[in-house]
Amino acid sequence: MHPSHAGDQRENGRRQPDFAALTRRETQVLALLASGQPNHSLARQLGISERTVRAHITSLTRKLGIPTRIEAALLAFQYRDTLSAP
């Protein structure tokens, strides 16, 4: 492997998102997005406000370079095993 590609993690030929850039809470929110539940349900499960859930979603989509909550949910579903790992 060429050293310039050492940091690349690939799955099915695509670069794996940099989940390490997320905070613990952002990772929790992202993992819960895979369930397709609305923000108020995520807020209730996490014991935080819906506004805080929206803030976490805004932050994690920016960090991962994805434009929408729906795409974040699809990404979370695709990597659900990675996100739920301890």
Where do the model's predicted regions map?
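Intrinsically disordered or compositionally simple regulatory linkers and C-terminal tails
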Residues: M1-F19, S84-P86
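Helix-turn-helix DNA-binding segment
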Residues: R10-T52, Y79
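Residues within the DNA-recognition helix of helix-turn-helix
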Residues: R25, H56-S59
